[in-house]
Amino acid sequence: MSVLLQHQFKPLPADKQIDTCCFLDSVSHLPAFFDCFGSAIFSPIKADITGNISKIRSVYESNPSKFKTLQMILEGEKELHGPQWPKVGATLALMWLKRGLKFIQVMLQSIADGERDDQNPNLIKVNITKAYEIALKKYHGWFVQKIFQTALIAAPYKDDFLKALSKGQTVKEEECIEKIRQFLVNYTTTIEAIYIMYNKMNAELDYKA
């Protein structure tokens, strides 16, 4: 499962502070995940994630010591931007990024849990749909939702998707699933910590894209 395990997310410390540099290093490799779908139709999600990573990196590199953790970015921007916050800067970029990361997490967890369409067990549409409905749908307007429905038509077979995750190597499904579970441990913990942080700081926005 080279696409995922080559750049594992690190365990979080007890205080759940997320080191910005380590986070950016791990998350910067995730856009390649969408290449595993084998269709450019998923490129808008990939582009959105890539763009938001760049925005966060730009803020971090402007003052690495001040923005050492993601929590410090939100706190610093809240003080800097006043009433405009959280609709600005890296705070807004991370808000959207975490939703894209949640999409990946829910989809992979659904596959690892064995959820499938009994009529078409080798399709992953049910896993992608679940991830979209949980992580992204409520934040998308009618037009974007229609684009996603079109993308579903181009969803790959599970065998092809798992092979792509393994960088073209033929690996037993059980081995692929086990590697997905390994990846999800720290990845899920990190995403949950970001969501908790946004809720605690009242930084979550519900407007539609």
UniProtKB/Swiss-Prot annotation:
Pfam families: GLTP. Sequence repeats lie at residues 45-55, 56-66. One of its GO terms (cellular component) is cytoplasm. Beta-D-galactosyl-(1->4)-beta-D-glucosyl-(1<->1)-N-[(9Z)-octadecenoyl]-sphing-4-enine binds at D48, I49, T50, G51, N52, I53, S54, K55, H140, Y207. Keywords: Cytoplasm, Lipid transport, Repeat, Transport. It is found in: Cytoplasm. The keyword Cytoplasm applies. Accelerates the intermembrane transfer of various glycolipids. Catalyzes the transfer of various glycosphingolipids between membranes but does not catalyze the transfer of phospholipids. May be involved in the intracellular translocation of glucosylceramides. Belongs to the GLTP family. This is Glycolipid transfer protein. It comes from Xenopus tropicalis (Western clawed frog).
